């Protein structure tokens, strides 16, 4: 679990949000089924140290303090939304979701692809259609990643959502026939195979014609 410190944000509004960003802080909000929205702020320098280790499925221990440094509350939350500047890609706002025990939640879990497909050795290439898998689960049963082994995939082979192995109690929200991973056949391979087939078929047609003339 990642630990993150935040301060209560007393003043709200766009002007205050801009001021915070100029001062090296990121405005955020904490909310949930049983939680009234709590505006907070986080030091950008603190956020940058852990940001690369956090996904939507990562439980975060959020320690909320007042401006005097006194701890107001500690919550287990999940990073639900990241807003970035359209030009600089800088993080400008965060949404943290606090689930309620016994209340199932929807969350995106990173897909971890392991192995090298047989089809890639033959000239194909691996296409991952879903980097994250949307699931429904209990808050205390959130998988950190969903692993899929692609070693046995040959040219044209597909792994569907129904093929994913999920922990008990975790439900995939993709349709059963949704393609998750596939080994695609390069166009040049298809063209070569088609050309060879045409060349093989042509003499047969000529021979049949000669036989008919005889």
From Swiss-Prot:
Transmembrane segments: none annotated. Residues 194-214 are annotated as: Disordered. One of its GO terms (molecular function) is 5S rRNA binding. Keywords: Ribonucleoprotein, Ribosomal protein, RNA-binding, rRNA-binding. Residues 204-214 have a biased composition (Basic and acidic residues). InterPro entries: Rbsml_bL25/Gln-tRNA_synth_N (IPR020056), Ribosomal_bL25/Gln-tRNA_synth (IPR011035), Ribosomal_bL25_b-dom (IPR020057), Ribosomal_bL25_C (IPR037121), Ribosomal_bL25_long (IPR001021), Ribosomal_L25_dom (IPR029751), Ribosomal_uL5_bac-type (IPR020930). One of its GO terms (biological process) is translation. GO terms for cellular component: cytosolic large ribosomal subunit. Pfam families: Ribosomal_L25p, Ribosomal_TL5_C. The keyword Ribosomal protein applies. NCBIfam families: bL25_bact_ctc. Belongs to the bacterial ribosomal protein bL25 family. CTC subfamily. Part of the 50S ribosomal subunit; part of the 5S rRNA/L5/L18/L25 subcomplex. Contacts the 5S rRNA. Binds to the 5S rRNA independently of L5 and L18. This is one of the proteins that binds to the 5S RNA in the ribosome where it forms part of the central protuberance. This is Large ribosomal subunit protein bL25. The gene is rplY.
């Amino acid at each position: 679990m990642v630990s993150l410190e935040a301060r209560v944000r007393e003043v709200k509004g766009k002007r205050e949000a801009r001021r915070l960003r100029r001062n090296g802080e990121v405005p955020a909000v904490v909310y949930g089924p049983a939680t009234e929205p709590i505006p907070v702020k986080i030091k950008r320098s603190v956020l940058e140290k852990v940001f690369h280790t956090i996904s939507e499925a990562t439980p975060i221990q959020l320690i909320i303090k007042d401006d005097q440094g006194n701890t107001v509350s500690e919550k287990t939350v999940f990073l639900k939304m990241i807003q970035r500047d359209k030009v600089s890609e800088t993080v400008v706002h965060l949404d943290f979701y606090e689930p309620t025990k016994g209340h199932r939640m929807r969350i995106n879990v990173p897909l971890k692809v392991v192995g090298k497909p047989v089809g890639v050795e033959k000239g194909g290439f691996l296409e991952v259609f879903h980097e994250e898998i949307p699931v429904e689960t209990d808050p205390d049963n959130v998988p950190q990643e969903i692993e899929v082994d692609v070693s046995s995939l040959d040219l044209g082979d597909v792994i569907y959502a129904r093929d994913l192995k999920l922990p008990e109690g975790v439900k995939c929200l993709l349709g059963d026939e949704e393609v998750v991973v596939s080994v695609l056949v390069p166009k040049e391979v298809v063209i070569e195979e088609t050309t060879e087939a045409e060349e093989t078929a042509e003499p047969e047609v000529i021979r049949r014609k000669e036989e008919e003339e005889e």
